[in-house]
């Protein structure tokens, strides 16, 4: 005798084992053939597949950690209240064809129109619409000059020991 408790670890089967009540409105009217239900083995074999969760923060990267793009415009924006600054950003046409706005981190940059850049996810929190960061020290964007601390974030090589 099979008990309901044995199928507790299979959520699909446990749902099938529960008694169901079918109202007359759910039954197919004027149907000559009966409704085909799945057998227990078919239910085990074809388990419900849950869709993979996608990262909704960086949609334009299309699942990649980085994307290459070409700068179409380099400009500055002012951040939201209460912050006050002039943030350097670039409008970038990605290799996928999308056009996004990316933040250029660090002090000073050599980004110009038609410069090839590498983008990563990660938004500038106080700039609306800026959802991506330019990776410094890759392609046409140089690393931050004179940077000693946090060099890996700004694309700077280790200085030569004198």
UniProtKB/Swiss-Prot annotation:
Its main location: mitochondrion. Disulfide bonds: none annotated. PROSITE patterns: RIBOSOMAL_S12. It comes from the Eukaryota. The keyword DNA-binding does not apply. Keywords: Mitochondrion, Ribonucleoprotein, Ribosomal protein, Transit peptide. Residues 1-37 form a transit peptide. It is found in: Mitochondrion. GO terms for biological process: mitochondrial translation; translation. Component of the mitochondrial small ribosomal subunit (mt-SSU). Mature yeast 74S mitochondrial ribosomes consist of a small (37S) and a large (54S) subunit. The 37S small subunit contains a 15S ribosomal RNA (15S mt-rRNA) and at least 32 different proteins. The 54S large subunit contains a 21S rRNA (21S mt-rRNA) and at least 45 different proteins. uS12m forms part of the decoding center of the mt-SSU. This is Small ribosomal subunit protein uS12m.
